[in-house]
Amino acid sequence: MAKVKGGLGRGLDSLLANGADNSSGDRLTTVAVKDIRPGRYQARVQIDDEALQELADSIKAQGVIQPVIVREHGLSRYELIAGERRWRAAQIAGLTEIPAVIKTISDETALAMGLIENLQRENLNPIEEAQGLKRLADEFGLTHETIAQAVGKSRSAISNSLRLLSLPEPVQEMLYQRRLEMGHARALLTLPVVEQLELAQKAVKNGWSVREVERRSQAALQNKRPEPKKTAAADIGRLNDLLTEKLGVNAEVKTANHKKGRIVLYFDTPETFGHLLEQLGIDYRP
């Protein structure tokens, strides 16, 4: 899908409002389950079969409590915008119809609504969540602060989630499969890329806790630093952590004799670089 033209920096409320055809309004009705097709704009890729069956059992007992959201797609056909789990569970439960809100909205608004609806839920895996957040940032030019407000998370949580996409692909796959947790990933991000993969593989093999991976990450970093004074080295390590948290990218303070030095900031995508400039208060458009 093409990126949104001329939408950089606009608020999410404006995006959603401008994408709707308010002349027709929303319609609450029932729609044949077979007439709905999966949406193109879903953050969710992986759906747990056991959880889906539990939802289907609930629907058999109580019906579909919350309508799905769709838009018209051809004659008597609908495209799903939000509510894929409910729609799939309704099929398992044997329902032929499902309550639905029919909206008349643009592609970009359908994308935003579908992503936000899924991101507000708790059961996305960390990589699905990061990929959904990245689409909101890339395709709509939304700031981390705006995204944070939309999905009900802190700005630092958004930045930390997006940083997961800088991990090596095999490590991302471990997160996708939930063999590693978000806490493991945060600890791994402090290390060079080659060491991230090595430690991740050991963590999965040995079933290490988040605390254990944090301890080993810190030990690996300390082994690389010259320590003329232990207190000074600890201070620099703490400063690295503070800069990384504040700027949303890996940061490293390097000193010579503790009198002069340099600060190195690492980024691996244009989007990460753009966010860094934003955090530094630099308004730059290439």
From Swiss-Prot:
Transmembrane spans: none
Domain of life: Bacteria
Keyword DNA-binding carried by entry: yes
Pfam families tied to this protein: HTH_ParB, ParB_dimer, ParBc
GO cellular component term, pick one: chromosome
Organism phylogeny: Bacteria, Pseudomonadati, Pseudomonadota, Betaproteobacteria, Neisseriales
Family: Belongs to the ParB family.
SUPFAM superfamilies linked: KorB DNA-binding domain-like, ParB/Sulfiredoxin
Gene3D superfamilies: 1.10.10.2830, 3.90.1530.30
Single annotated GO MF: DNA binding
InterPro entries xref list: Chromosome_partition/occlusion (IPR050336), HTH_ParB/Spo0J (IPR041468), ParB/RepB/Spo0J (IPR004437), ParB/Sulfiredoxin_dom (IPR003115), ParB/Sulfiredoxin_sf (IPR036086), ParB_dimer_C (IPR057240)
Identification of the protein by name: Probable chromosome-partitioning protein ParB
SMART domains membership: ParB
Species, as recorded: Neisseria meningitidis serogroup B (strain ATCC BAA-335 / MC58)
NCBIfam families per the UniProt record, alphabetical: parB_part (TIGR00180)
Function: Involved in chromosome partition. Localize to both poles of the predivisional cell following completion of DNA replication. Binds to the DNA origin of replication.
Entry keywords, A to Z: Chromosome partition, DNA-binding
